Amino acid sequence: MVAAPCFRVLRLWTYAHRCDLGHTDPLSRRTEMTTTERPTTMCEAFQRTAVMDPDAVALRTPGGNQTMTWRDYAAQVRRVAAGLAGLGVRRGDTVSLMMANRIEFYPLDVGAQHVGATSFSVYNTLPAEQLTYVFDNAGTKVVICEQQYVDRVRASGVPIEHIVCVDGAPPARSR
């Protein structure tokens, strides 16, 4: 996993596969897991790391102004995954993340992976015309963004099922 420039990921197991919540929930196997078992999915590796050292710092902003422990990171990932599942996001769906560098990006990204969705970061400087191509090409079902980008997302004209703002409710549509 490559961290955004202003965040440093201190430790994350990386494996090529993804999981979905309908498969095996790694936390339910917590007591069975040994340190010699290799996780079989990226999601299982993430949850295993969170269980092994829950109070260790997982994310830290430059200067240490914001930190997130593995315990908090994993809890946020579970909430995000549940929220996305509640919106109807399933394995194979696409979730687009459009925001400035924020610590919230990481639980959103990993939470989408936990429901089997493909998540990707969208440059927040793209004009609506380019967003049209990006969202159409990806088959975006949900866009998670900051309020300041909602008008541009809507101006893309792509029929996004849900726009979720990390900093409040999306502004009402202009008539």
Curated annotation (Swiss-Prot):
It holds the Pfam family AMP-binding. This is Uncharacterized protein Rv1549. It comes from Mycobacterium tuberculosis (strain ATCC 25618 / H37Rv).
